[in-house]
């Protein structure tokens, strides 16, 4: 007598193949593979296998990802569910400009992890700050997923969380990468501090800090080191929200090797330990002094700009007359007080105009108190450069646009939703790589010497181009001759056919 199945006939008719078994799980019909096995008794039985999909009543069998992959590899899948149209231009442009950065990553990380880090950073550079749970959608719809289709890495939330955790916990490869950047830099290094709002109550680094009232949320503090001459970032590091920059910078200086470096930093990094470390191993520093500094108060009482004057020319169109006073504190340390006469005169005129307009915040008493100190800079240095070079180095440091400034001001980098300590430091490294790629794009756009063209414009024009799958090849679509010519002037010529 044949045993009757408990599965309805209108479900059984969708059974995908032999050696499969349908199981009713409260109305959900799951399909499993099975195979016949000989039992110790000599009789035959079945051994249940893995889940291959489910049957939807009235619709049919729906294979899961694992079974689809198996069918595809065996050539048995009647149709392949895959993306046939991907974004191309902005990704290909950034990869063209930053191929050397991928090479550096491959020198420090296993090849597949280097590609995963690089893909993450390229997406961040193309779209600005993007939360970790949004990266996978960009990746799957981009030429990156075609380029790295034979790699096993994923770009989903869990996969990227593991990646960031590993980078932060097993930090030697990232440190090797950063040290290489430092060693190959111009040795003119600026260090800058930023405050970032944190929206994660569980973030190990998020605490109340000096900007908590303004941010309406806990904060983390980010310190960036970057090369003043080449305009590239060298190091990103996040610290506790309650930390102060002058202590955090000591940790950075002690954790990396710096030699024969000229540091240009702001007065938030002024501390005996930081200044000592910035003066060892052939290093020197330039730092502005706060008004509360005892030497500033002393010098102000009798200040006369008797040491000399010079013309400062930051570019071909701009110049300023600078007078200065210089004195030595010891054999290696000087204080130089600079006064930009043009800036001083400009601010005097502006303030007087505000007084004439009746602005309540302006008064003759305040004018008399402040007018002598507009455009005045008190700088302390252990550099042996002459005064004009010290001033030029200090002013040049403020002209650098870091990737953090770009995303903070233009790409909605307002808060982090990161909790894990290691993930936070892993993200620091992703930010560094993203900043490196962004600096390459900045340089390429700057070299166009077209004031009306920005990095946004270039990415937008390149972003129109797509690759569409035809047979086994990807073909370039949605191009415009004018855009192709502009991108070609940057050295980037889009591929018409991409074989993957």
Regions found by a protein language model. Name each.
Residues 389-418:
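Short amphipathic alpha-helical "interface-anchor" segments enriched in bulky aromatics
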Residues 418-442:
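Basic, amphipathic alpha-helical segments enriched in Lys/Arg and hydrophobic/aromatic residues
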Residues 218, 238, 282-396, 464-500:
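An anionic, glycine-rich sequence signature occurring as long contiguous blocks
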